[in-house]
């Protein structure tokens, strides 16, 4: 494949992945409304689960590109923290008051599995399983420990809604359910094929211009699939519900470092030596960026233009390291 055509395919696939993920999320959202799914579950499904990043990393792992799979997770997480958090904070103050402390303190657990994998890649199966179980534990704790008042309120509203729903409305809802299911299926199929072509075009570009695959995964793919996160946080801030966008970003970080990373380790073949660029950026992420975010959220309990400066500075350091090493 000529490099010009490979670049076109790469760009088209990114666009398809972006919109296909919207199809999936729209479908799940409508299903949640029809089935009266609790808000906390909807938040994880609609916002926290990062389908395009997951599919891209898993496809990379299956296609013999383990460094892109892992680099994509690290790069996406660094950009989510240093850019998706910091950019809106330049214009609006973001409060962490409604984010429970233990959620922020759980982030280093996921970072630990990444660092251990980078040091001992031969134990990838062990660290992959630990990352997956860490995410499952995170979800279970959230469901079990949710606010009893909110749970009671939801149950009461659900009972009232059931009493008010007529037989005609029930039939209408049964017909309506096919639309979100169709959206979901179309989105999943489009995501699968677009991700396959994305990885193939990536491989062709790497071969043509001799770009290190770790650098490519860390910056280009990771940056290109974060557009919806920027818009989500901006909109939630303008609607005076910043905890929705903030919770979505945190959920995405935990999903990618738990499920996306963990399953990628299980799918990939034995990797060669870890590239220096990925190792350095992994240390930067776990040893510097995560502690900075945790300190800001727990000590200052808000993110504004002043506290966003350290994160933006770390983003610049990350980009420089990615190209230098």
Locations of regions flagged by a protein language model:
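Hydrophobic alpha-helical segments, chiefly the membrane-spanning helices
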Residues: 1-325
